[in-house]
């Protein structure tokens, strides 16, 4: 089973998946269902649902992986390329920094929630934070650009 830091990395990638699903679908419902899940079955269903939504975005070329250069204090190496996921939804463009989970991550996460459903709550809270920060950054960019979409 995953060690502590590896568990945190898995939770982060699951949170990225949920955030991408939220931004693409423009609905926090999946994140809410995930964060409020009381059983592993409920978490598993939401994981399936969000992966289907993301798959639709990938198939439509509205979700794609990329790399971006970060200039800021939030990241250890300024000017370095970081993995990211671009999301285009209803004319809005968002970028989630980090990776989406692998199939092994999903398998490990499902084992983790068998031990404690708290991991799903943690991933849900993190996903909402990621999405809110990205949406807020997008709105600030629009106001700086005279209200145009990013």
UniProtKB/Swiss-Prot annotation:
GO molecular function terms noted in the UniProt entry: toxin activity
Note in the entry: The aCascade complex was purified from strain P1.
Alphabetized NCBIfam families for the sequence: cas_Csa5
Classification via InterPro entries: CRISPR-assoc_Cas5
Keywords annotated in UniProt: Antiviral defense, Toxin
Function: CRISPR (clustered regularly interspaced short palindromic repeat) is an adaptive immune system that provides protection against mobile genetic elements (viruses, transposable elements and conjugative plasmids). CRISPR clusters contain spacers, sequences complementary to antecedent mobile elements, and target invading nucleic acids. CRISPR clusters are transcribed and processed into CRISPR RNA (crRNA). In strain P2 toxic when expressed in vivo in the absence of CRISPR loci A-D (strain P2 contains 6 CRISPR loci in all). It causes strong growth inhibition, a significant proportion of cells have degraded or no DNA by 20-24 post-induction.
Gene name of this polypeptide: csa5
Pfam families: Cas_Csa5 (PF09702)
Effect listed in the UniProt record for changing residue 32 to A: In strain P2 protein is soluble upon overexpression, behaves as a monomer. No longer toxic when expressed in vivo in the absence of CRISPR loci A-D
Signal peptide: none
Subunit structure: Probably oligomeric upon overexpression; does not interact with a Cas5 (Sso1441)/Cas7 (Sso1442)/crRNA complex. Forms dimer and tetramer-sized oligomers when overexpressed in the absence of CRISPR loci A-D; the oligomers are probably responsible for its toxicity in the absence of CRISPR loci A-D. Part of the aCascade ribonucleoprotein complex, minimally composed of Cas7 (formerly Csa2) and Cas5a, which binds crRNA. Other possible components of aCascade in strain P1 are Cas6b (SSO1437) and Csa5 (SSO1443), while SSO1399, Cas5b (SSO1400) and SSO1401 have sometimes been seen weakly associated.
Protein name (Swiss-Prot/TrEMBL): CRISPR type I-A cluster 2/Apern-associated protein Csa5-2
Biological process, per Gene Ontology: defense response to virus
């Amino acid at each position: 089973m995953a060690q502590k830091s590896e568990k945190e990395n898995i939770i982060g990638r699951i949170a990225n998946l949920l955030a991408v699903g939220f931004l693409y679908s423009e609905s926090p419902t999946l994140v809410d269902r995930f964060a409020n899940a009381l059983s592993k079955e409920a978490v598993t269903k939401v994981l399936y649902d969000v992966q289907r939504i993301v798959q639709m975005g990938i198939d439509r070329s509205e979700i794609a992986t990329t790399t971006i250069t970060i200039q800021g204090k939030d990241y250890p190496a300024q000017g370095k390329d970081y993995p990211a996921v671009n999301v285009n939804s209803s004319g809005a463009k968002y970028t989630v920094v980090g990776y989406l989970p692998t199939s092994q991550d999903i398998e490990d996460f499902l084992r983790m929630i068998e031990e404690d459903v708290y991991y799903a709550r943690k991933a849900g809270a993190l996903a909402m934070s990621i999405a809110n920060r990205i949406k807020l950054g997008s709105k600030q960019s629009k106001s700086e650009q005279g209200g145009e979409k990013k």
